[in-house]
């Protein structure tokens, strides 16, 4: 229970919370393999463009998005009424790929109250200078 209060407080105070090792290493490896599979299936699509339209009927992405450990943490922040508005991979190769510009995800979903989270799962290690800026 203490952890849930710390996570929620971090999120409320800072607008984000960093929670490490949420999903098991085996599942991280499956995510990496899934991205590779998508790259082979859609060779003309850049990996940072693997968006909702390619994933909506994908069984693996549904398994990933229903990961109970991840859902438990989301519930700690916004409560039990969780809805998914979209899912995509931002798969970037080292020293390649377009940047994701500054934005606020909340502007895409005009909800009241704005009780929303965006979940980013890192599938590989990232250099400190290459991570999300908040």
Please provide the spans of the model-predicted regions.
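Catalytic core of non-heme Fe(II) oxygenases with the double-stranded beta-helix
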Residues: 98-134
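Non-heme Fe(II)-dependent double-stranded beta-helix
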Residues: 1-111
């Amino acid at each position: 229970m203490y952890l849930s209060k710390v996570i929620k407080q971090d999120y409320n105070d800072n607008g984000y919370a960093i929670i490490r090792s949420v999903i098991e290493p085996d599942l991280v490896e499956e995510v990496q393999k899934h991205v590779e599979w998508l790259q082979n299936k859609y060779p003309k699509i850049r990996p940072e463009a693997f968006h909702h339209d390619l994933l909506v009927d994908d069984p693996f992405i549904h398994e990933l998005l229903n990961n109970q450990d991840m859902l438990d943490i989301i519930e700690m922040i916004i409560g039990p009424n969780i809805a998914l508005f979209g899912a995509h991979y931002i798969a970037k190769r080292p020293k390649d790929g377009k940047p994701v510009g500054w934005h606020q995800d909340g502007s895409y979903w005009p909800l009241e109250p704005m009780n929303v989270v965006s979940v980013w799962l890192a599938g590989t290690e990232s250099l400190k200078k290459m991570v999300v800026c908040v």
